[in-house]
């Protein structure tokens, strides 16, 4: 997908976190003209920044991985909901974008995204009618959605007939006790039969998502993931043997957010005779993180050899900067950042660096300090007796789970390795 996106003009002012209050409104795409630098105190804190070198590194890492695994990437846009980052991903070779909700689909279309894989069920009348209208009015729009029941197939078929358009679907394979998706081959056959009865619904592939599988240890989780992809394989073989797939390559898709290798190899192992396309849907690869995804990556290195690694692993691209603003007692300080600024659903942010304006030329690694709690606007930090931190110092934090940090920022600056602001991104949650 090389189609240029339509990126809306965003005017920044002091209502955006990070922008000084008396700054006259200016377009986001002109932010480099401000000559701002994070370390010089040109922006207000807290401030979430994206490191340009890490974004580029992670993009190249994924490209090499996909080439090695003979797969394509349809990254989940819910991670960033940023047209600027969507454009970066599509220019980097992404096959399309994945969406989970109708709001995300509508937002992507506002940016003129031409291929969308809706990794969820499309069920509401208004939602189905919107997609049908987009397909009718835009012949280049390529759209896929998931089905896991004959009832849903009939709902889609009825609305598609009313709108006089066709809908491409993938059968979702799930797991007992987990989320959506057929649980058995018999359920999948019933869905296939319903699709075959509709002239408007076209079966294009099989899909699953392994990222929600839980277990007492890594080995049992990985065994369950292998079983899930075995079921996907059986469903695909059944659908091919009965002639259910429509014209075009059969799409075999896995999530891959934390299990890139298992998703890519799980779909590649399906023994079909038909031409096929292996699609993984990770959105978090672009920014990586400090703990959650990094732990998964370390585990992947144990499972498999990945091209270029470990010499050039992904890097965390998101940093949250704040000031130390209070040291009210021994062993405890506070930073100007909280739940409104950082993800906290999996792990709390981790202190990485500190910087003292007027004394340091570059940020320095900060060991022995730990964020132990967050309020809405405060970070509680345990500090050792020999801590160098003082009121007014700047601290940088790494995060876990990029999705729930991006949704707290309408704007993020992109910085070079000297923390000069060279660009920026907007988000549309």
Model-derived features: where do they sit?
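A charged N-terminal "starter" segment
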Residues: 1-133, 425-429
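A non-catalytic, amphipathic alpha-helix used as a structural packing/dimerization or gating element
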Residues: 53-61, 190, 227-234, 395
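Conserved, mostly hydrophobic/aromatic
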Residues: 55, 78, 108, 171, ...
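Active-site-proximal beta-alpha core segment in soluble small-molecule metabolic enzymes
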Residues: 75-218, 227
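Active-site loop/helix belt of alpha/beta enzymes
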Residues: 168, 174-303
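Active-site loop ensemble at the mouth of alpha/beta enzyme cores that anchors a bound cofactor
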Residues: 223, 260-357
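C-terminal accessory subdomain/extension
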Residues: 327-429
